[in-house]
Amino acid sequence: MDKVKIALQYMLPKHLLSRLVGKLAAAEAGALTTAAIKWFIKQYKIDMSEAAQSEPEAYKSFNAFFTRALKPGIRPLDMDADIMVHPVDGAVSQLGPIKNGRIFQAKGHHYSSLTLLGDQAEDAKRFEGGDFATIYLAPKDYHRIHMPIKGTLSKMTYVPGELFSVNPLTARNVPGLFARNERVVAIFETELGPLAMVLVGATIVASIETVWAGTVTPPTGKQVFTWEYPTQGPDAITLDKGEEMGRFKLGSTVVMLFAKDAIATFAEGVEAEAVTRMGQAFANLKDVKHAD
């Protein structure tokens, strides 16, 4: 059955399907929208007591429901200066060192950090010998993405690609999954060197958004696009630790890349398949801070 599911993913018109779902999710259909939201809550056992608006009727569209805010204080932020926090609610897929420009995806599968970053060689070089972490956001999860540490945006790259599902089954069976799906790469300058936040698209993900650019995709592009940003002066975009940096409409994956020597150790309990909650301790930082 697993082989059939994977084969279907290769055959389906994934972009067309995703855009169709996106249009439906954006529709404000009154009682029909409310019914769909109620079904989704029941199907995925979503705890609406955490949401700022807990009643399904409060959401005019499915997208509004899916990108719902949480109640203030529901995800306390670890403010220890030597701690990096989880950027999302989800589950760790994999994490570890970047070796010879390769990132571990699943047993028998690695992929290139250069390809992940849209073939931006200078960017890939900055993360050689560093660490990575891949976090999967299931449909039930809170889908806003936050900063693990304070950073100033220096570059954003849109990379066109496939829209395979990014669930654990697909990660185990589709080679180079995260480096072949459509994605948005945001690079920040931090006290510990560069930080890459890679927002990976997936089947029926209606859009990828950032707080500084709004909706980046759709529309789907056919070539790599890059935007550069000032890191100093009044136009610099600096986001604090825990501040929202983007969001998905429907579930997907975030891949983080860290500079060499940025991370001392991952926090206790942070390992493959571990559940993550935004704001909790993710990693212990090196004592010696540097600028790239």
Curated annotation (Swiss-Prot):
EC number(s) from the headed UniProt entry: 4.1.1.65
Post-translational modifications: Is synthesized initially as an inactive proenzyme. Formation of the active enzyme involves a self-maturation process in which the active site pyruvoyl group is generated from an internal serine residue via an autocatalytic post-translational modification. Two non-identical subunits are generated from the proenzyme in this reaction, and the pyruvate is formed at the N-terminus of the alpha chain, which is derived from the carboxyl end of the proenzyme.
Pfam families (UniProt xref): PS_Dcarbxylase (PF02666)
GO molecular function: phosphatidylserine decarboxylase activity
Pathway: Phospholipid metabolism; phosphatidylethanolamine biosynthesis; phosphatidylethanolamine from CDP-diacylglycerol: step 2/2
Enzyme category, top tier: lyase
Marked site: Cleavage (non-hydrolytic): G251, S252
Active site, per annotation: D89, H146, S252
PANTHER family referenced in this protein's UniProt entry, alphabetically: PHOSPHATIDYLSERINE DECARBOXYLASE (PTHR10067), PHOSPHATIDYLSERINE DECARBOXYLASE PROENZYME, MITOCHONDRIAL (PTHR10067:SF6)
Assembly notes: Heterodimer of a large membrane-associated beta subunit and a small pyruvoyl-containing alpha subunit.
Protein purpose: Catalyzes the formation of phosphatidylethanolamine (PtdEtn) from phosphatidylserine (PtdSer).
Protein's UniProt name: Phosphatidylserine decarboxylase proenzyme
